[in-house]
Amino acid sequence: MITDSQDQMKRGNKMGIVSSASGASCWRGLDYYKNKKIKNLKKINDYEFTSTAIGTNNYDIYLDVSHPRRSTCTCPLATGKRIVCKHIVATFFTAFPEEAKDFEKEQERL
């Protein structure tokens, strides 16, 4: 059974993806999510996922929700860097759709 503190910790870890990304990456990631550009989402465990972003080019994504900067993407922006790009954010929103809704609600309040 998940306790309230475990649930808060889990939510805090999940929100780390959004807080680690730039505003532009969050909005573009939300757009990718809404347009269903993330394919082949595979759950490794509760905090790790892999996927493919479909666009002009296809990119492979590894998402580590517990450690956002360990997430990787083969796009030019993120390759070899510890950057949370739009593809990583889109994978996060695809894995956790409620977080996409929460992100939009939070932005409406600002």
Model-derived features: positions:
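Long, low-complexity, compositionally biased intrinsically disordered regions
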Residues: 1-110
